[in-house]
UniProtKB/Swiss-Prot annotation:
NCBIfam families: ATPsyn_F1gamma. This is ATP synthase gamma chain. Produces ATP from ADP in the presence of a proton gradient across the membrane. The gamma chain is believed to be important in regulating ATPase activity and the flow of protons through the CF(0) complex. It comes from Syntrophus aciditrophicus (strain SB). It comes from the Bacteria. The gene is atpG. GO terms for biological process: proton motive force-driven plasma membrane ATP synthesis.
Amino acid sequence: MAALKDIKRKVAAVEKTKQITRAMNMVAASKFRTSQTRMESFRPYAMKFMEVLSSLAVRVSPDAHPLLAAREAKRIRVVSMSSDRGLCGGFNSSLIKSTERFVREKIAEGLEVDLTPIGRKVREYFKRKYALVSDRADVMSKFDMTLAVEIAEDVIDPFVNEEYDELYLIYNEFINVSMQRPAVVRLLPLPSVGQDAEIEAEKRIDYNYEPSDEELIGKLLPMYIHVLIFRALLETSAGENGARMAAMDNATRNCDEMISTLTLQYNKVRQSAITAELMDIVGGTEALAKG
C-alpha cells in the first residue's frame, strides 16, 4: 500500500505541474499574438524607410556622413539581445552560443571586443567573462521605440568619436513559432544600406529630395539605426513568446505522458496487491477445509 500512496503522490505532483505549464502556455500565447502583431505592423514602415534610404545612399559619397565612413577595424562593439526570463526552450542558449562564437572569432583575429548585452539572460552569462558596456536588463517585457533610441544613442556617439570601428547586432530572427534563428548584422559603418533593404536596383525609385541629399541622409542615418534596433527588439520579443509557448506546450504533453505512465504503474501495483490478497484468501479457505 505504501507503493500505491507514493504513485498517487507523484501523479498529484505532475497534475499540479501540468496546471502550471498549461497556464503559462496560455499566457505565452496571448503575449505572442500581441508581439507578433507589433512585429508585422512595423515591417511595412521599416521596409519603406529602408527603400527611401537605399535610393538616397547610392547618391552620396561614403564621406558624406560619419556613419558611412569605413576604417580599419581594431576595436568592435557587439550588441547581443536575449530575453529577460527563461522557460523558453533553447531560445537564449542558441543566442548566447552564437554571440560567444562570434566574439571569440573576432578576438582570434586580433580585435578588441566590447560587449553590450540587452536582456537579463545574456547579461548574466557574459558578465562573468567579459567587461560589459551599457548593459540593459528587465526591458524586454514592455518596450517601445524609446528603448531603441536609447540603445542607438549609446552606440552611435562612440562610433563617431572613433572609440570603436565596427558595430554588430546579434539577435534571434523570428522565422515562425517553433523556429528562431540567431542573426549577426553589421550596423556600423553603413556602406550597403541597399543590400539590407533587399531592393533590386532596377526597382529602386529615384526620389527628388529637399533639402540636399547630404543634409537629408544626416537626419535619416541615425533613424535607420533606430529602425534596425527596434525591429530586432520586436523579433526578439515575438521569438521569446513563441519559443515559450512551444516549450510549455511540449511540457504539458510530457506531463500527460507521465501521468499515463504513472496511472498504468498504479493499476499494475494495485492489481498485484488484489491478486496477492485473493491468493491469501484462497489459501486460508483451503486450509480451513482440510482442518
